[in-house]
From Swiss-Prot:
IleRS has two distinct active sites: one for aminoacylation and one for editing. The misactivated valine is translocated from the active site to the editing site, which sterically excludes the correctly activated isoleucine. The single editing site contains two valyl binding pockets, one specific for each substrate (Val-AMP or Val-tRNA(Ile)). It catalyses: tRNA(Ile) + L-isoleucine + ATP = L-isoleucyl-tRNA(Ile) + AMP + diphosphate. It comes from Protochlamydia amoebophila (strain UWE25). ATP binds at residue 594. GO terms for molecular function: aminoacyl-tRNA deacylase activity; ATP binding; isoleucine-tRNA ligase activity; tRNA binding; zinc ion binding. Its EC number is 6.1.1.5. GO terms for cellular component: cytoplasm. Belongs to the class-I aminoacyl-tRNA synthetase family. IleS type 2 subfamily. PANTHER family: ISOLEUCINE--TRNA LIGASE, CYTOPLASMIC, SOLEUCYL-TRNA SYNTHETASE. It comes from the Bacteria. This is Isoleucine--tRNA ligase. A motif ('KMSKS' region) lies at residues 591-595.
Length: 1038
């Protein structure tokens, strides 16, 4: 029944599984089989196909795949439609580089139609590479029904979304200070600007503004953007800060600044004399002489005066802030409140206009040095330095952003903030702290969303404007056809920009802007189904999504735009459950960089270790809890070596002996009688329960960890403890039950592991399944939890045994005693009678594992350990607060009476400053400290002591076990079959020969030796516990 396992790499084996899936159309069938079952809706965030997939995509894709495979196995119909983000700056950047274009002027000279068609040509450049990587990683998605944001139906639905918002009064055109990419010539939204902060050094300048009322008095103002000084229209002070007028002893001038900031400008108070102190409110309305004369005429309309602003700080600077309202959001609102209109002498390339003739055509930041130089010549610079701070860079062009006033179209997010917060309260987040932490706080501080971009390759904003300012919003292709009388085959700019129409005697022309591509991706739930023009019922069944998953950065991206639009349109969230993954960094913790090549090529890692190893490495990492993961090949290799190889070896172990004895599974599996079989089946059911709990709560770490632990228990305990049952040459109920149990466990385990490691699960299942089972493990139902098969008492017993064995092995290691060396006695102590009973019941097993001849038991642990109490600071701190130090001193003085009460889970009362406080075992930890002079170890209620004295008999037996170990190592290295008999030739010492005299039968039985010869042989050199030996093994002919 069972095929022989070939020697091949994980990569080779996985490729065979891929072929099996593709030829059998297993993905399609897995969805088809569940039709008519409850629908599980998933939205896939669309990636750009202009770049290759990286580890971040692989992580998010793996998380999505795990959940959807699991839900399918749980009986849901879970379609998986892939999508492509086709519009936006990443695509435009590629074309600009290809054709040497830079900025709007060069693009328009090139031709918008040609430019857009070039964008269309490259937008799906890497789709085949994406498909290959997605498939090779084992992710099942539907590439045959992909949605694309550049397709006509998708774009039409985006228009519908916009018109709905406009009709609800949630769209307006306004002048605001926005993050602005001079390189791209367009404003960005606040969440885009938050994506790419860098540590930079900018000039720090303190400038003296001369008072118009007193020529010897100067207001000292601070700035880190000297280029904005040419547009200065006001100075801001705080009404709540105290200011001082001081006479400077060197310049003889009077300076005004915050009292608290004097120390930042004077080393010694003897350098100045305080003339007066006063609140900032007294400065309101005072006038000063502008530094430059570019906008002197603005003095007549209220400029060049001091205004009030509560947000001014005295942490740095002077407590007075120079104000250029066109280039700062706070400045803009403060001046607006004071009736001062902004001036913006900076164009869309970030260059000064002819309003500043000396710097016309110069990028603003490049003018800093000359502006500072001019002010120094005028003796206006009081202090010049450098400010090291975080500054936003354009996430697309990686150039520094500026902030400037722009006229743009907004979604009035602030107006519906309460609806966003209500929608968020209905979403289940993993990890849960995202809900009211990173995402919730972002919603609380949400600003109106700038959705228009002065670009070309995107969905045009469907606004037509008459010369008098009247607006007409178009919400469909049919509406535009009726208005213009023109047929429509495409909605991109070069098809509709020139379309105008007459209405009420007015000519309406389209505005030139396109949508922010985040508006398109936020419209995806509607646009992917061309809602509401088609598929109404399909949309209503699929909204909101049951599940989505993306990276932490999407809390300010896709998660945000989905929520804004769904709350605005339908007063509900767009998704019910969200898994947020962390970022994948280079091994040194730095951001992954193609330029620096600081990370391994995913294709190479897949080829070396296989996709399952990468999947499990990521799933069994902090990344599934929104924490960062520093990716390392060694981490992937460790998962392969410690989890997947042991799992595969467990399967091949079973297969080897099943083939040797021609064992076949019966129709009925007998209920296991042996405790170890009952134990592993109980653990298997516990695993089913824990995986279900974690997966149903979308907590992958809670479901993956038990799987990893189970593989360890199966391979390092169950199979190791059961090996001899499989080696039995004669058929017996014991051997049959061992085969039945391991076969059942492996089959069920492949179903549990299938969502996590789909390739190895399929490979094992394919060779173990009988003809009446589903064709693929991925067509199976997820195992059902069987409460009747749980033996929690047995699980607790075995856990106590494993703790004991682990402590014993640690003691042996500490005292350099191999486990192969028998010891005379071990003593086990526990004050917990249940634990002691567990250990007594498993005495034989413990004796074998620890390789000791005799075990004694004691309930008096005080012979081995002393008890000491210490506070559980995390828990107790909430109860006693500032009295923690006093509580700690009291607890550390506890005697036997209090310790006994706590160990028996009873409370203890203490008095703190006259007040009684009741302490429980949660408040206080009782530590067991091994007494001096005893070779012992402790964990929890279990203590073990070893007798490490070795007599001759023990040493000889240990030597016999060492011989068996080395000969079996030679058998494995020679690739002998497990049934091959051997002849043994040895050149050794009299002590080893003496060992054979006593233990020959044992040694020969363990290594399958038919004959042993001693003599002057040249063989493999071994050190057998200090006895130099040469060994030769040969296959026996009989």
């Amino acid at each position: 029944m069972f095929e022989e396992v070939l020697q091949e790499s994980f990569d080779e084996r996985e490729k065979k599984v891929l072929k099996f899936w593709q030829e059998g159309q297993l993905f399609e069938r897995s969805v088809e089989n569940r039709k008519g079952q409850p629908l599980f809706t998933f939205y896939d965030g669309p990636p750009f196909a202009t770049g290759l997939p990286h580890y971040g995509h692989i992580l998010a894709g793996t998380i999505k795949d795990v959940v959807l495979r699991y839900k399918t196995m749980k009986g849901f119909c879970a379609p998986r439609r892939f999508g492509w983000d086709c519009h936006g700056l990443p695509v435009e950047n590629e074309i600009e580089k290809t054709f040497g274009l830079s900025g709007a002027k060069s693009i328009e000279e090139f031709g918008i139609a040609k430019f857009n068609e070039e964008c269309r040509n490259i937008v799906l450049r890497y789709t085949e590479e994406w498909k290959f990587t997605v498939n090779r990683m084992g992710r099942w998605v539907d590439f045959n029904q992909t949605y694309r944001t550049m397709d006509l139906p998708f774009m039409e639905s985006v228009w519908w979304v916009f018109k709905q918002l406009y009709a609800k009064g949630l769209v307006y055109e306004g002048l605001k200070v926005m993050p602005f990419s001079a390189k791209l010539g367009t404003p960005l939204s606040n969440f885009e600007a938050s994506e790419n902060y860098k540590e930079v050094d900018d000039p720090s300048l303190t400038v003296a503004f001369q008072s118009r009322d007193n020529s010897n008095t100067y207001f000292l103002a601070w700035t880190t953007t000297p280029w904005t000084l040419v547009s200065n229209l006001a100075l801001m002070v705080s009404p709540m800060i105290e200011y001082a007028e001081v006479q400077d002893h060197v310049s003889k001038r009077n300076y005004i600044l915050a009292t608290e900031r004097l120390k930042g400008y004077y080393k010694d108070s003897g350098e100045y004399t305080i003339v007066r102190k006063f609140p900032g409110s007294e400065l309101e309305g005072q006038h000063y002489i502008p530094l430059f004369d570019y906008f002197n005429d603005r003095a007549h309309s209220g400029a060049f005066k001091i205004i009030l602003e509560d947000s001014i700080s005295v942490e740095e600077g002077t407590g007075i802030v120079q104000t250029a309202p066109a280039f700062g959001e706070i400045d803009f609102y403060a001046c607006q409140k004071a009736g001062i209109d902004p001036v913006c002498p900076v164009d869309n390339n970030g260059q000064f206009t002819d309003e500043i003739p000396e710097y016309k055509g110069i990028f603003v930041k490049e003018a800093d040095k000359d502006i500072i130089k001019r002010l120094k010549q005028q003796a206006k610079v009081i202090h010049q330095g450098t400010c090291h701070h975080r500054y936003p860079f354009c996430p697309r062009s990686d150039t520094p952003l500026i902030y400037k006033t722009v006229r743009t179209w907004f979604v009035a997010v602030e107006k519906i903030k309460d609806r966003l917060l209500a929608a968020n309260s209905q979403i289940h987040w993993t990890p849960e702290h995202i809900q009211y932490g990173r995402f919730g706080k972002w919603l609380e501080g949400a600003r109106d969303w700038a959705i228009s971009r002065n670009r070309y390759w995107g969905t045009p904003i469907p606004l037509w404007r008459a010369q008098d300012g009247e607006i007409h919003v178009v919400g469909s292709i049919e509406e535009l056809k009726q208005l213009t009388g023109n047929p429509l085959t495409d909605l991109h700019r070069h098809f509709i920009d020139e379309m105008s129409f007459e209405k009420n005697g007015k000519t309406f022309k389209r505005i030139p802007e396109v949508f922010d591509c985040w508006f398109e991706s936020g419209s995806m739930p509607y646009a992917q189904n061309h809602y509401p023009f088609e598929n109404r019922e399909l949309f209503e069944q699929n909204f909101p999504a049951d599940f989505i998953a993306e990276g932490l950065d999407q809390t300010r991206g896709w998660f945000y735009t989905l929520t804004v639009l769904s709350a605005a349109l339908f007063d509900q969230p767009a998704m019910k459950n969200v898994i947020v993954n962390g970022l994948i960094l280079a091994e040194n913790g730095a951001k992954m960089s193609k330029r620096l090549k600081n990370y391994p090529d995913p294709a190479e890692v897949i080829q070396q270790y296989g996709a399952d190893a990468i999947r499990l490495y990521m799933l069994h990492s902090p990344a599934v809890k929104a924490d960062d993961l520093s990716f390392s090949k060694s981490g992937v290799e460790l998962v392969l070596r410690q989890i997947l190889l042991p799992l595969w070896n467990a399967y091949t172990f079973f297969l080897t002996y099943a083939r040797i004895y021609n064992w076949k599974p019966g129709k009925l599996v007998q209920k296991p009688e042996l405790a170890i079989d009952q134990w592993i089946i109980s653990l298997l059911n516990k695993l089913v329960h824990e995986v279900e709990q974690g997966m149903d709560d979308y907590d992958l770490s809670r479901s993956v960890e038990p799987f990893v632990n189970f593989v360890d228990q199966l391979t390092n305990w169950y199979i190791r403890r059961s090996r001899r049952r499989f080696w039995d040459d004669k058929e017996s109920p014991n051997r049959t039950q061992a085969f039945e149990t391991l076969y059942y466990v492996l089959i069920e385990l492949t179903k549990i592991s299938a969502p996590y490691v789909p390739f190895i699960s399929e490979a094992i299942y394919q060779n173990l399944r009988s003809c009446d089972m589903p064709e693929s493990v991925h067509l199976c139902d997820f195992p059902h939890y069987q409460q009747l098969s749980r033996h929690e008492k047995l699980e607790a017993e075995m856990e106590a045994v494993q703790v004991t064995v682990s402590l014993g092995h640690a003691l042996r290691k500490e005292h350099k005693l191999k486990v192969r060396q028998p010891l005379a006695t071990a003593q086990l102590a526990s004050a917990d009678p249940k634990v002691l009973d567990f250990l007594k019941e498993q005495q034989h097993l413990i004796s074998e594992e620890l390789n000791v001849k005799e075990i004694t038991f004691s309930s008096n642990e005080k012979d081995f350990v002393s008890l000491k109490a210490k506070p559980n600071f995390r828990v107790l701190g909430k109860k006693v607060g500032k009295l923690m130090k006093l509580a700690q001193l009291t607890i550390e003085q506890f005697g036997q009476k209090e310790l006994t009460e706590l160990l028996n889970h009873r409370s203890v009362e203490i008095i703190l400053e006259g007040h009684p406080v009741l302490l429980t075992s949660e408040d206080v930890q009782v530590e067991r400290i091994v007494r001096e002079g005893i070779i012992a170890a402790n964990q929890g209620t279990i203590t073990i002591a070893l007798n490490t004295n070795l007599n001759k008999e023990l040493l000889l037996e240990g030597l016999a076990r060492e011989i068996v170990n080395k000969v079996n190592t030679m058998r494995r290295e020679a690739n002998f079959a497990v049934t091959d008999r051997i002849q043994l030739y040895m050149q050794t010492t009299t002590r080893v020969i003496e060992c054979f005299d006593q233990y020959k039968n044992y040694i020969c039985q363990e290594v399958l030796a038919t004959d042993v010869q001693f003599g002057p042989y040249e063989g493999t050199d071994w050190d057998l516990n200090g006895e130099p030996t040469k060994i030769i093994i040969k296959k026996s002919e009989y």
